Amino acid sequence: MSAPLANDTFLRALRRQPTEYTPLWLMRQAGRYLPEYNATRARAGSFLGLAKSPAYATEVTLQPLDRYPLDAAILFSDILTVPDAMGLGLSFEQGEGPRFARPVRSEADVAALSVPDMASLQYVFDAVSEIRRALVQDGRQRVPLIGFSGSPWTLACYMVEGGGSDDFRTVKSMLYARPDLMHRILEINAAAVIDYLNAQIDAGAQAVMVFDTWGGALADGIYQTFSLAYMARVVEGLRAGADGQRVPVILFTKGGGLWLESMAQTGADALGVDWTVNLQLARVRTGGRVALQGNLDPTVLFAEPDAIRAQVRRVLEDYAAGGDSDGHVFNLGHGISQFTPPESVAVLVDEVHTFSRALRTRLP
């Protein structure tokens, strides 16, 4: 039997239930802005050495929680674990980011693709279980654990391009010239992501997030067909947790503010939004069907403390202008920069918790 949660504010917010304050966590909260993370990564020898070790992954997952009173932990891993398990030869070059030795470019490459055996990703599921155990203090679990995956489209971008890209010329060329091949890749990716997230849920993930990092690179109409439809398939394929309760699902398309109405119809419990979106309008546009997560510009954290506090208050007030503060998870609009001063994060966390409590006393 799992330990009860000491702090379930994050899960209640995802379910749009009343909360005493606005919970927060940060995308890339375990990362290079923390000196303790860099020390652990040095011991691991490489990024993959870090990500593929359940012990190291557990250590770095807990580091931001030991420094700040965050309301959720997120599994330390990488979105490219799934295509790596497909045998595409993932490596991380210093200063260049991820690279695949065998990108998916030809009809033969696509024909050779298959959903990977989840046993090859056991290190991820072992990390989930180990993190859940490590979160327990005095018989209670400190905060919930989030699992995650890249979206089918975002994974396809890396698989076809062979790494990151400024213009996605190769993958978009395939999409327009051979949509049949692209749909085949996306079908395999969606099936793999469903298996992957369900295995994380079985291992103990209490919420899951789908990162559609490159969905915003698509044209209107194309996004709905080649990204959103496959994320909806993923949401539909996820199962309940060990307690029989639905595990909340968060969808995040960076640059996807144009499509919030459609995203809210996927069955997801929450939508991540970036800093280009007004949260009050986002609530209206989504009709109260989903919780919202976001949406501070990460570069605000390079400002002075007073400016950080002012921008935090602006985000919280924008959401509360919709009538209440329920159903809001505070986050950045994208991942935290590696150059962020750790003390700025302390200011952010304090202001979110303090001001959101005060704001609730002023709301009807």
Swiss-Prot record:
Task: Cite a single GO BP annotation.
Answer: protoporphyrinogen IX biosynthetic process from glutamate
Identify the EC number(s): 4.1.1.37
Positions binding substrate in this chain are 28-32, 47, 78, 158, 213, 334
Keywords (A to Z) from UniProt = Cytoplasm, Decarboxylase, Lyase, Porphyrin biosynthesis
**CDD domains registered for this protein in UniProt:** URO-D (cd00717)
Disulfide pattern: none
Give the pathway listed in the UniProt entry for this protein: Porphyrin-containing compound metabolism; protoporphyrin-IX biosynthesis; coproporphyrinogen-III from 5-aminolevulinate: step 4/4
Localisation per UniProt entry: Cytoplasm
Residues at the site labelled Transition state stabilizer: 78
**Leading EC class:** lyase
Q: Name one GO cellular component term.
A: cytosol
Molecular function in Gene Ontology:
uroporphyrinogen decarboxylase activity
Q: Kindly report the protein's main subcellular placement as a broad class.
A: cytoplasm
* UniProt catalytic activity: uroporphyrinogen III + 4 H(+) = coproporphyrinogen III + 4 CO2
Q: Which Pfam families match?
A: URO-D
Q: Which family does it belong to?
A: Belongs to the uroporphyrinogen decarboxylase family.
Report the protein's function. Answer: Catalyzes the decarboxylation of four acetate groups of uroporphyrinogen-III to yield coproporphyrinogen-III.
Note the subunit structure.
Homodimer.
Alphabetical list of NCBIfam families matching this protein: hemE
Task: Please name the HAMAP family in this protein's record.
Answer: URO_D
Q: What is this protein called?
A: Uroporphyrinogen decarboxylase
From which organism does this entry originate? Ralstonia nicotianae (strain ATCC BAA-1114 / GMI1000) (Ralstonia solanacearum)
Question: The organism's lineage?
Answer: Bacteria, Pseudomonadati, Pseudomonadota, Betaproteobacteria, Burkholderiales
